[in-house]
Amino acid sequence: MRRVAVIAGVIGFALGALAAASVFFAWPMPGHGGAVATPNHPSFSEVQWPYPTDEWGKGKAFRCEAADCGVEVNLYVRAKIGFCNCKTGVSDDAELDRLSDFRLMGEKLSVLGPGRQINVAWMKGRSRAYAISGPFQAQNSALAVAFNDRCDAIVATAIVAQDRPAAIEPSVIEFLNSKTVMHWAEVTLGL
């Protein structure tokens, strides 16, 4: 009788450990490469521009906390006056790559797929997702977005604290269409 109880206990323990392991390894974990649902009400707050001034000057920086966006998102937006292809705008991935602020994204980038067309207010452009890797770096990804008004481009870089930036793209594009960003863009572009 005692032997049956010990065997039943061992089997029960093994099944419990198996269930716990499957839950741990199967459920997505935000910030650890799991899928992140698009939040219903993302809330971006303006923060100080963290980068040194370069030929494009300072831009605007915003942060959406994990509680609001499902994962922490740092968004950097700035104008590149006269730098966009005046005839075609941001119409392909090559132009998006030329305009993007890759220096803000990290050391090593890998394209996660082809870019796609986006609209921000009256402007058209493209977005594209990248994986970021480097020594001593947490798993991050980035979303490069560029759109233009004639020869002037607005470039946005979203650094996402997980490996699937496409999940947060709708929230980033929605924020780029907000009054906050559009007012800044109109003033900066002299419209």
Regions found by a protein language model. Name each.
Residues I7-P28:
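Hydrophobic membrane-insertion alpha-helices, especially the h-region
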Residues A26-P42:
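Ser/Thr/Pro/Gly-rich low-complexity linker/stalk segments immediately outside membranes or between
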Residues Q48-E95:
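Secretory pathway targeting signatures of secreted, lumenal, and periplasmic proteins
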Residues E55-G57, C69, W122-K124, A146-A153:
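Short, solvent-exposed coil/turn segments at beta-strand boundaries
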Residues G59-K60, G70, K87, F136-A144, ...:
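Short, surface-exposed coil-to-beta transition loops
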Residues I81-M123:
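Structured, soluble extracytoplasmic/luminal domains of envelope-associated proteins
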Residues G106-D149:
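Signature of long, low-cysteine stretches enriched in small and polar/charged residues
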Residues R150-L191:
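Surface-exposed amphipathic alpha-helical segments
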